[in-house]
């Protein structure tokens, strides 16, 4: 046959639109491992939360204190099932909304409403 090449194959793949599509040739291009390094975007490093959740970082979990010094980032990397979340009992309402809001922010300033030095008696 002139004009095309085909081979017999029983390879099936899942595409964006269909599952188990028979193809004549397939190469798996998806990565199934990660080296742990995250890329900078426009020269700015990501904020890697490590064992902290976004809630633990924002609300001041003592285990997340090292993240307070981070002033800017290109994106936030939160690991699934982070150990250090909120350190008080209760449910964090609208957690997904907080994550969504922070996804478009590259920095913020944290301040104390009641500074310890001036607000509390010694």
Swiss-Prot record:
GO-annotated cellular components: host cell plasma membrane; membrane; viral envelope; virion membrane
InterPro entries, per database record: Capsid_hemagglutn, Hemagglutn_HA1_a/b_dom_sf, Hemagglutn_influenz_A, Hemagglutn_influenz_A/B
Functional summary from the UniProt entry: Binds to sialic acid-containing receptors on the cell surface, bringing about the attachment of the virus particle to the cell. This attachment induces virion internalization of about two third of the virus particles through clathrin-dependent endocytosis and about one third through a clathrin- and caveolin-independent pathway. Plays a major role in the determination of host range restriction and virulence. Class I viral fusion protein.
Location(s) in or outside the cell: Virion membrane; Host apical cell membrane
Gene3D superfamilies per UniProt: 3.90.209.20, Hemagglutinin Chain A, Domain 2
Domain of life, source organism: Viruses
Principal location: virion
UniProt keyword list: Clathrin- and caveolin-independent endocytosis of virus by host, Clathrin-mediated endocytosis of virus by host, Disulfide bond, Fusion of virus membrane with host endosomal membrane, Fusion of virus membrane with host membrane, Glycoprotein, Hemagglutinin, Host cell membrane, Host membrane, Host-virus interaction, Lipoprotein, Membrane, Palmitate, Transmembrane, Viral attachment to host cell, Viral envelope protein, Viral penetration into host cytoplasm, Virion, Virus endocytosis by host, Virus entry into host cell
Subunit structure: Homotrimer of disulfide-linked HA1-HA2.
Protein name listed in UniProt: Hemagglutinin
Record's keyword annotation contains Transmembrane: yes
Gene Ontology terms, MF aspect: host cell surface receptor binding
Description of post-translational modifications: In natural infection, inactive HA is matured into HA1 and HA2 outside the cell by one or more trypsin-like, arginine-specific endoprotease secreted by the bronchial epithelial cells. One identified protease that may be involved in this process is secreted in lungs by club cells.
Note from the entry: Major glycoprotein, comprises over 80% of the envelope proteins present in virus particle.
Family: Belongs to the influenza viruses hemagglutinin family.
Glycan attachment residues as annotated in the record: 7-8, 20, 84
Pfam families from the UniProt entry: Hemagglutinin
Keyword Cell cycle among record annotations: no
Membrane topology, as annotated: Single-pass type I membrane protein
Any single GO BP term: fusion of virus membrane with host plasma membrane
């Amino acid at each position: 046959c002139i004009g095309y090449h085909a081979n017999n194959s029983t390879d099936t793949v899942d595409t964006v639109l269909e599952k188990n599509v028979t193809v004549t040739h397939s190469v798996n291009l998806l990565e199934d491992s990660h080296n742990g390094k995250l890329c900078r975007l426009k020269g700015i490093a990501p904020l890697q939360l490590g064992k902290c959740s976004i809630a633990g970082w924002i609300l001041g979990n003592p285990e997340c204190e090292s993240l307070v010094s981070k002033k800017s980032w290109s994106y936030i990397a939160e690991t699934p099932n982070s150990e250090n979340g909120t350190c008080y009992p209760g449910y964090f309402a609208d957690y997904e909304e907080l994550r969504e809001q922070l996804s478009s922010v590259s920095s913020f300033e944290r301040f104390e409403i009641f500074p310890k030095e001036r607000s509390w008696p010694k």
